[in-house]
């Protein structure tokens, strides 16, 4: 299976970026993960990063290929909930962070996904959205009940109120699972935070992704979302995967223009490493 992958995360107009995204590739497929740390709680970025790390550990410990993707998704999301709570208790003082979560397993020509909160998974085919997750949010419930129109969802004053999350509460979240989807060549799977989809409509996203390299189109969409959301633009994060070929189903390869955006923690670690190296060099010169 040959795929094209791109991801991007922009800070928007916020003080820091609490979104995190992960891409895990293995012989039989790939796992895409996205978490939007809750800004109304302390350490949202910790919750989102813990989500990514929990899935990394789970995939490393899983038989290959993943025997039951739905069981893997639900079990790992519930484990992430407990890991986030534990990470919060280790802080001084202890905190109760939370994050949204949307995760997709792509394996042997099929896709399975699960989500908690309002970060979305889309499946685009020929530029058209044939599936998207339903937000676990107050505004989505209003829309489902016919109390507001679809056009009002992204602008409603309570659009950021979610009804489920990973972490924050002692009670485990209810994980919503998709059905298994058979993929075809050209299909594009998109995971994104509300900072991305909130300023763009589905038709606009699908049309753009269907024309050009994912790296270029995804960057353009993210930058457009930030511009439209300014001066209060949220963190804007997305990862997209395109099926180039379904041949060689027992082996997955990603083409060379995969675009990986370094998250802030990695940048901070690199800066500290450079500073330590400079300090060590100065000490040696003084000696």
Feature map (PLM): residue ranges:
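PP2C/PPM-type serine/threonine phosphatase catalytic domain
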Residues: 1-287
């Amino acid at each position: 299976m040959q795929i094209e992958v791109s991801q991007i995360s922009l800070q928007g107009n916020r003080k820091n970026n609490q979104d995190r995204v992960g891409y895990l590739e293995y012989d039989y497929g790939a796992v895409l993960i996205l978490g939007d740390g809750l800004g109304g709680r302390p350490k949202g970025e910790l919750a989102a990063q813990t989500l990514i790390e929990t899935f990394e550990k789970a995939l490393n410990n899983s038989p290959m290929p993943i025997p039951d993707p739905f069981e893997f998704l639900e079990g790992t999301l519930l484990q992430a909930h407990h890991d986030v709570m534990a990470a919060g208790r280790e802080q001084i003082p202890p905190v109760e962070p939370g994050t949204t979560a949307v995760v997709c397993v792509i394996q042997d020509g099929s896709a399975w996904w699960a989500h908690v909160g309002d970060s979305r998974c889309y499946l685009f085919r020929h530029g058209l959205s044939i599936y998207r997750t339903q937000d676990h949010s107050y505004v989505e419930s209003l829309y489902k009940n016919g109390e507001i129109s679809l056009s009002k969802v992204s602008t409603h004053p309570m659009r950021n109120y979610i009804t489920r999350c990973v972490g924050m509460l002692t009670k485990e979240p209810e994980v919503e699972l998709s059905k298994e989807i058979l993929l075809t060549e050209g299909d594009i799977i998109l995971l994104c935070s509300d900072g991305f989809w909130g300023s763009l409509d589905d038709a606009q996203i699908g049309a753009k992704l269907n024309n050009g390299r994912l790296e270029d189109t995804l960057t353009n969409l993210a930058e457009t979302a930030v511009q439209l959301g300014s001066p209060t633009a949220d963190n804007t994060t997305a990862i997209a995967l395109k099926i180039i070929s379904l041949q060689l189903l027992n082996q997955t390869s990603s083409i060379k223009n995969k675009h990986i955006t370094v998250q802030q923690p990695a940048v901070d670690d690199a800066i500290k490493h450079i500073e330590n190296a400079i300090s060590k060099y100065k000490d040696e010169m003084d000696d």
